[in-house]
Amino acid sequence: LLVDKPSGISSRDCLDLVRKILNEKKAGHCGTLDPLATGILPISIGEATKFSRYVSNLPKKYNVKILFGLETDTGDITGKEIYKTDAKFSTSELTKVLESFIGIQDQIPPMYSALKRNGKPLYYWARKGISLKRAPRSIEVRDINLKSIKKKEEIELEISCSKGTYIRTLVQSIGKSLHSAATVLELRRTHIGPFNENNSVKLDSSKDFYLKYILGSDEALKIFPKIVLSKEETKKIINGLQVDYNARQEKEGIVRLYEEEGS
């Protein structure tokens, strides 16, 4: 189920509400969104939870509104002010800096995140005023599109990136590269893999409405090649035997296996 998460609640709160409406014990969300953020949040239900990690690993696209000249402890406008500074840079300087962030890079996750440390999420320690050392993680920013400049201090970007990319951290890095500071005003996830916000449903929907829009597990796996097995091959797979289907696959990796129609 592709839910349009509203601002002001956590991804877990969103999941719990959907689980309650559908009366489903087994469910999970694929790809955490910050409480401030809105947008597409895939929720796997029942047996589809087995495929959650594949959806979570899909590339994402975000729209983000940025305020320059301000840095907060959370990296967004909901946090405590750390300091203010000037935002003195030209459009050409901004464009050059944005281009410099496209590509594979290391990023240190923020303290205000759901990553676990010593059995607790990092934000638990951050709220206690404790900063823990975090190992950098490899991410990829595939594209950054400058959508608008409303004021000198406020811009809107469209960012395409890999899983595990923290937009708040990226925004702070952009601010520092411009010899300024930056914080997230608004953040919306518009795409995750083949799914976009037009496929999502509002959170405050009824069970009957949700049931109309629940997708089959297969929809989440269409990024993988499809291979149809013969009756004999199907029997081998069921009995735990190997099947050679390399001739039908262009490269190594995960595939979707289907029974031959009618078998």
PLM region spans:
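The conserved catalytic core of RNA pseudouridine synthases
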Residues: 20-24, 42, 132-179
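Glycine/acidic-rich beta-strand-loop module
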Residues: 26-56, 124
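Short, structured patches in soluble enzyme cores that scaffold and shape functional sites
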Residues: 66-68, 127, 143-148, 159-163, ...
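Structural signature of FAD isoalloxazine-binding scaffolds in flavoprotein oxidoreductases
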Residues: 53-68, 132-146
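Residue-level signal for inorganic ion chemistry
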Residues: 43, 64, 119, 170, ...
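Extended alpha-helical targeting/anchoring segments
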Residues: 113, 117-142
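Acidic, low-complexity central loop/insert segments
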Residues: 54-106
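Accessory RNA 3′-end/elbow-binding domains used by RNA modification enzymes
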Residues: 1-4, 10-33, 37-40, 92-100, ...
